Amino acid sequence: MKTGIYDSIEINDYHALRDYYNSTRIKLAKKSLNTLKSHDENWKDEGRKQHYDTGNAFEVMLTDKENIENRIAITNEEDWRNEALKDNPKLSEPSRSKVYRELKDKFYGDNKSKYIITPSIQDDCLEMLKSCYSDELIRSLVKESDSQKSILWHCANTGLKLKTRPDLIHHKSKTIIDIKTADDGSPEKFSKSCVNLDYPLQASLQIKGVLESGLLDEVKNYFWLVVEKNSPYNATLYRFTKDDQEMVADSLDYYIGHINEAVNSGIWGGYNQRADNKLGILDLELPLYYRR
């Protein structure tokens, strides 16, 4: 597929564009280039895995209300149990019956392309929506933003093919919003999640893509919208500060450069790429608990 800004690429088709590097693969290169190479060699497109998916279902409810029925399916376990008991009232475990399994298999077969959730997850998502809509700023940002733009472009520095898919872009304020769901959305917990899952690198690639593709001429704000999946369902905007943006952008460019060199040379290094000497020798840093 050619570079450009696309509105209607299905998520599975987006992930299948392997010529373009996304943040997930760049994160692998941070560990080692060989880690990325091994991942790519063993990757296969298994399609969307059908499992209870609170995060993606909530995102659809928040950003694509017109297509909820086309993108989300809600399980009918109670109906399946009732049908199984109607067939055999003596069943002690209806969910293990042939009738139940057939109804369940048919449901999943009929909804292969949809996100699957239970009625209780649907209730949670509705509470999460209430929390977002009760905040005037969040409500305004969501209502006035474009969602799920797929950006494919060549890195301005290296020419490497890159891709990103911001959740929301608010053109008027030149703001990117990334939606995250969490069991605990407190500042203490979310800051740890940011580090562990490297959300800043993902954010930096989104900023780079929006700017280098020309979608925006400036990104004034980058927010993570973090919504808790259970009571009290707090919805919070966290700002990616300009100082941190600059630091992470430098790191992102560094790893993009490493990937580009490996692609062109065919040489994929291991952990020795982290060495500060030409020999590739690493100084072992013993953990603090060992020093006590």
Predicted regions and their residues:
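Metal-dependent nuclease catalytic cores that hydrolyze phosphodiester bonds in DNA/RNA
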Residues: M1-K163, Q273
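Hydrophobic/aromatic-lined pockets within catalytic cores
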Residues: L62-N67, C155, T181-D184, L211, ...
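Secondary-structure boundary elements
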Residues: D135-K143, H170-I176, L211-K220
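Glycosyltransferase-associated regions of secretory-pathway enzymes
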Residues: D146, H154-R165, D183-D184, Q273-R292
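Conserved catalytic cores of phosphodiester-cleaving nucleases, focusing on short active-site segments
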Residues: P166-F190, Q206
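Short acidic, glycine/proline-rich loop/turn micro-motifs
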Residues: S186-K192, N234-Y238
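Gly/Ser/Thr-rich active-site loops/lids in small-molecule metabolic enzymes
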Residues: V195-S204
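Metal-dependent nuclease catalytic regions and adjoining charged, substrate-binding loops involved
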Residues: L205-R292
